[in-house]
Amino acid sequence: MAESTLRLSVPREGLSAGDVILRFPSLDDVDAMLPAFTDPELREAGNLPAFSREELVASLRELPSLAEAGRLLALAAVHAPADEVVGGGTLHHLDAERKIVEIGYFVLPHARGRGVATTIARMLAEHAFSLGIERVAAYVNVGNTASERVVARAGFTREGVVRSMPKPDGRRVDKTLYSLLPGE
């Protein structure tokens, strides 16, 4: 079978929907994004790794090469009028042969309750479809009702529980699998 040329990419100016822009994070975003990687509650809900400030800087510096390879898109979510970082989103675990990708998202506490997470999830999925993806998956920790509501509002369908999935810290938890197909 021929190797797929499907790659994850995003326009330099990012993606936008309403007043939310998804763009590549810069080193200027470190202080705004750091709580997502240091706050235990945010990390647990978002399946985010623990990063010190220095580790986050190093990670942000590495993102361009990962994006260039076409296998990971990690984007900052910005409230457009103020250029204020409100969260982030990823397209990751690309299976180019089967045209499947996973999404991830987080919203900082000050931006919650405004539909930002749903907007991020929908933007990422629509962008993935524009690249030729045929299935977008979202894994949500069992019991994370806020995130379950996000993916449901974004149009995802609940498929069931996947047992003993790894988290960035090595623990294993059960997750609910949701998916979205083009046209849904």
What are these regions (language model features)?
Residues 1-40, 74, 78-184:
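Acyl-donor (CoA/ACP) binding surface of acyl/acetyltransferases
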